[in-house]
UniProtKB/Swiss-Prot annotation:
GO terms for molecular function: translation elongation factor activity. It comes from Methanococcus maripaludis (strain C5 / ATCC BAA-1333). The gene is ef1b. This is Elongation factor 1-beta. Belongs to the EF-1-beta/EF-1-delta family. The keyword Magnesium does not apply. The keyword Phosphoprotein does not apply.
Length: 89
């Protein structure tokens, strides 16, 4: 099977969400879903808001990134999470 690399864009619920804690939570979530976290970064957006990007590496399988994306969206401090890039390696 092929390896999939995905870039997930995560928007926190507010600027008050602790950035480093959110990044650590996302990294743990990825690793608990049979995937590797290849990196977590953040970019300022506006008015104190920021976007977190998570690079995920996993084996190609049925359902793909859906379980990880759904788990990220279910987190308390996450407004939205969506896969913005996907490629096979």
């Amino acid at each position: 099977m092929a390896t999939v690399i995905a870039k997930v864009k995560v928007m926190p619920t507010s600027p008050e969400v602790e950035k480093e804690a959110l990044k650590e939570t996302l990294k743990e979530l990825v690793e608990n879903n049979d995937a590797k976290c290849r990196g977590v970064s953040d970019e300022p957006l506006a008015f104190g808001l920021y976007t977190v990007f998570v690079m995920v590496e996993m084996e190609e399988k049925e359902g793909g990134m859906d379980p990880i994306e759904e788990a990220m969206n279910a987190l308390e401090n996450v407004e939205s999470a969506e896969v913005v890039e996907l490629s096979l390696v």
